[in-house]
A protein has these predicted regions:
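NAD(P)+-binding Rossmann beta1-loop-alpha1 motif at the extreme N-terminus of oxidoreductases
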Residues: 1-58, 62-66, 91, 127, ...
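Methionine-biased hydrophobic packing positions in alpha-helices, especially
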Residues: 13, 17, 37, 66, ...
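Helical "substrate-binding/catalytic lid" subdomain
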Residues: 169-269, 273-297, 301
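Rossmann-fold dinucleotide-binding core
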Residues: 8-10, 76, 99-177
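Hydrophobic beta-strand scaffold residues
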Residues: 28, 48, 118-119, 160, ...
């Protein structure tokens, strides 16, 4: 019997990740609760199914999930119709969702109690990284589970890190995304200041890319249009990684900081800025659109 992979959650990130697995010649079926996402996946030549019951069959050796929040992961794995009691003991569970550490550990421990290997493996790199299979993947779980998952993770990503025990992958991702949110705000402030000073934005951008002010939002994912082709800022801020998702991750970071009495003043400030931005109806825009708030009266790049 041919062993297959089950992929749950084929949204903006999950779909291109699943595509890369398919292109690598793996037997793959996908499912999403959204009919729109399923139709989109079908148009990408992915084999879709209409339910979890149809997805989790005896030939499934690996399950990959890419879901929005911890409550979704918990429902898929541990809910009334959860898959944790449907997969075989030889199955490997890979949760690529970015969720709270507590939920990640809870799901993983239940899997281990049943003799099933599981890792948390959140990703970084946005939609472009998912499409190009250049994602950074941060893994929490046993060394044995990490080694078993590595060949498959390498199909989806470029840099694969074993961060530590269960939950460590999400912990590392939350720390990374807190820094990313802060950096995007800093990049927006710097470029909009240059605009107010009437300095050529393209020249300032080139200078910053090659100077000590460089960062990922500057060199790869700039918040203003006309700087790097293919970025959301050049596509009316159509999301690669939405402001709503960044806001969620900053909330996770803030909750983590509180739980261990860590001081994260910039992280807290970034959360306040993104939270207000989302409340104003911008949650579905790319997170780089935060530059609209930073720009004030200097902003002349309208978004719908």
């Amino acid at each position: 019997m041919t062993k297959s992979i089950a992929f749950i959650g084929v949204g903006n990130m999950g779909c291109p990740m699943a595509e890369n697995i398919m292109k690598a010649g793996k037997s793959l079926k996908v499912f999403d609760v959204s009919e729109k996402m399923l139709e989109f996946a079908k148009n990408k030549n992915l084999e879709t199914v209409s339910s979890l019951d149809e997805l989790i069959t005896v030939d499934v050796e690996t399950v990959i999930t890419m879901l929005p929040e911890g409550k979704h992961s918990k429902e898929v794995y541990l809910g009334e119709r959860g898959i944790i009691n449907k997969v075989s003991k030889n199955c490997l569970l890979i949760d690529c969702s970015t969720i709270d550490i507590q939920t990640s550990i809870e799901i993983g421990k239940k899997a281990l109690e049943l003799g099933i290997k599981m890792i948390d493996a959140p990703v970084s790199g946005g939609v472009m990284g998912a499409q190009k299979a250049t994602l950074n993947i941060m893994v929490g779980g046993s060394k044995e589970a990490f080694d078993k998952a590595f060949p498959l993770l390498k199909i989806m990503g470029k840099n694969i890190f074993h961060a530590g025990d269960l939950g460590s992958g999400n912990g590392a991702k939350i720390c990374n995304n807190m820094a990313l949110g802060i950096a995007m705000i800093a990049a927006s402030e710097s470029l909009m200041l240059a605009k107010r000073l009437n300095i050529d934005i393209k020249k300032v951008h080139e200078i910053m890319k090659n100077a000590s002010g460089n960062s990922w939002p500057i060199s790869v994912y700039p918040p203003l249009p006309g700087l790097i082709d293919g970025t959301p800022s050049n596509n009316n801020y159509r999301p690669g990684f939405s402001a709503g998702m960044m806001n969620k991750d900053l909330k996770l970071a803030n909750d983590c900081a509180k739980s261990v009495n860590a001081e994260t003043p910039l992280g807290k400030m970034a959360l306040e800025i993104y939270d207000q931005f989302c409340k104003e109806g911008n949650d579905t825009k790319d997170f780089s659109a935060i530059s609209k708030v930073i720009g004030g009266s200097a902003w002349d790049y309208p978004i719908d």
